[in-house]
Regions:
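Catalytic cores of soluble metabolic enzymes centered on carboxylation/carboxyl-transfer
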Residues: 1-148, 263-493, 497-498, 502-510, ...
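Short beta-strand-turn/beta-hairpin segments enriched in glycine/proline and small hydrophobics
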Residues: 4-5, 194-219, 233-251
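Short, structured interface segments
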Residues: 70-72, 179-205, 273-277
Length: 528
């Protein structure tokens, strides 16, 4: 059952799956389906589920021409050494490592908030070294929106989407295909299953050779100082009543032997530290190629709505480069004018303005005239810091501030039913956006300038957004404040004043026409 411990002294059966059918082919098909739909996770352990699935897919098994020595022969020959979906697995591991680092960052953020001054890492993305079958990878991972990531590795850019679909199980979409993902980090190693195929991916730790599963070290045929070639045997291990060996993933010199013979080791336990020769650690001929899942639809990515969504993600504190966005604002403006109707373009821009206003409203450093009902006369930033120290004390905060906070959190899908983890992640992104705000002001100015020169027709909602922007940026972002006033005048005030003026002129013309029609003295004097 879930939560049970499996003793390391002997091999314990987790489950036995038996399939029946009217024919051998039907029984095998049912067994394959049962294994494919079964999720087994052993913390600090491993199962032979994938190995059994590989056996069932082997043509020799399908034809029934195997003998009793077939499995042993495969193991000795290193059969099934190549695992499909390794490219997807490395991307998934990079994303999991990114989220682990973000969890640490959010912990630091909360600790600093408890001390009265929250601090965030305003850097964009994370670079975390990974190692898979002897090859090192340094993917740069960025979270570009909720559930969406961009991974750059070996000169290839990959867009990935991850959705939760059950306990421990997720779905990952890369290269236009969606696959089942199971990801678990244990003992410094990522266990990643893609459509049931397991991969163990470690952090690049400079030549540390680790145990692939719980096992007994039955032999170490090398000594410290020995030089080994790629593929040479470094250690013999026994697991699941089967003996195998750990091979050198690259040529090098044995720097240190960590494990000892006849001892039990867990998954990921260090066995040997191998010093690579020169750059051989990165020159593995078996390196994974990522071209098959690379993002290729450049035209779709350049679409106006996609670019505007990137701007929204930037303002929400996700890992979007403001310099790249700022440099392409002219192209975005011209493309949007061609691709979108004025109403749709204004709708998206208004949402971007709302995000900007809601975030800056939480960081005002001085009280305003709107805080007249607040006897303490504290700023919104002080209230935010109080909330970050203890999110359960919302009752002690002014209603106006909590309304601002709830409206801002709603941009991240956070409401009263959201988990603490979801809320913490949103608060971290809010603080990150504010930390980067100086680099984002130019984008807001460009969008406002477009509305100034193409005011079009706008509803009262946009009037409210502009009013809030004018109020919240006063004495803080003077360029935004002044331009927002100009836009408000151009979109709402000037058309109104022009209509009033035109109506006055029309009335004057009407009165003059009446005077011309009544030239006799008594009527003329009464009209005047």
């Amino acid at each position: 059952e879930e939560g049970d411990s499996i003793a390391s002294e002997f091999d314990s059966m987790i489950a036995k799956i038996m399939a029946y059918g009217r024919t051998r082919q039907e029984a095998v098909s049912r067994l394959r389906r049962a294994l494919r739909q079964t999720v087994v996770v052993v913390r600090d352990g491993a199962t032979n589920k994938s190995f059994v699935e590989s056996l069932l897919a082997d043509p020799i098994f399908e034809s029934g021409t195997y003998d009793f020595g077939w499995v042993d022969g495969l193991t000795k020959a290193g059969g099934y050494g190549e695992s499909p979906y390794a490219d997807v697995a490395i991307v998934a591991a990079a994303i999991a490592a990114y989220e682990e680092e973000m969890l640490i960052d959010r912990g630091r953020f909360k600790d600093s908030a408890n001390r009265g001054r929250p601090i965030v890492d305003a850097g964009i993305g994370k670079v975390i070294g990974l190692r898979y079958r002897g090859s090192g990878y340094e993917p740069r991972t960025r979270k570009v929106a909720s559930g969406r990531y961009r991974v750059e590795v070996d000169g290839v850019t990959i867009d990935a989407t991850i959705e939760d679909s059950g306990q421990l199980v997720q779905r990952i979409t890369v290269g236009g295909k969606t696959r089942r993902l199971l990801s678990l980090i244990e003992s410094g190693t990522h266990l990643v299953e893609i459509d049931g195929v397991p991969h163990r991916i470690g952090h690049d730790e400079g030549g540390v050779i680790r145990a692939p599963s719980p096992s007994v070290v039955v032999g170490i045929p090398v000594a410290e100082g020995d030089r080994v070639e790629r593929g040479d045997r470094l250690a013999g291990i026994e697991a699941m009543e089967r003996e195998s060996h750990v091979a050198a993933p690259f040529a090098g010199t044995v720097r240190e032997i960590v494990a000892r013979e006849n001892t039990q080791v867990g998954t990921g336990a260090p066995l040997i530290i191998l010093e690579p020769e020169g750059d051989t650690i990165d020159a593995d001929v078996g390196s994974v190629v990522f071209d098959g899942i690379a993002t290729s639809n450049a035209a779709a990515l350049a679409r106006c709505e996609v670019q505007l969504e990137r701007i929204a993600s930037l303002l929400l504190g996700y890992d979007v480069d403001p310099v790249a966005i700022t440099g392409s604002m002219g192209e975005i403006a011209s493309r949007c004018t061609e691709e979108l109707s004025p109403a749709r373009l204004q709708e998206i821009e208004s949402r971007i303005f709302e995000i900007f206003v809601d975030i800056v409203s939480l960081f005002r450093r001085v009280p305003t005239e709107d805080d007249v009902g607040d006897v303490t006369r504290r700023s919104s930033q002080e209230y935010l810091y109080s909330y970050l120290k203890d999110p359960t004390t919302t009752d002690a905060l002014p209603e106006r501030f909590t309304e601002h906070l709830e409206r801002t959190l709603a941009h991240y899908g956070v409401d009263d039913e959201s988990s603490e983890e979801h809320r913490d992640a949103a608060l971290y992104r809010i603080a990150t956006s504010h930390e980067r705000m100086t680099g984002q002001i130019g984008i807001i100015l460009t969008l406002l300038d477009r509305r100034l020169h193409d005011p079009g027709t706008s509803d009262e909602g946009f009037r409210d957004v502009l009013g809030a922007m004018i109020h919240q940026t006063r004495d803080r972002y003077p360029a935004v404040h002044d331009l927002a006033r100009e836009v408000s005048y151009a979109v709402f005030d000037e058309p109104f004043l022009s209509e009033v003026r035109a109506e006055a002129y029309r009335e004057a013309d009407r009165q003059l026409q009446l005077l011309e029609q009544h030239l006799d003295e008594p009527t003329r004097l009464s009209l005047i």
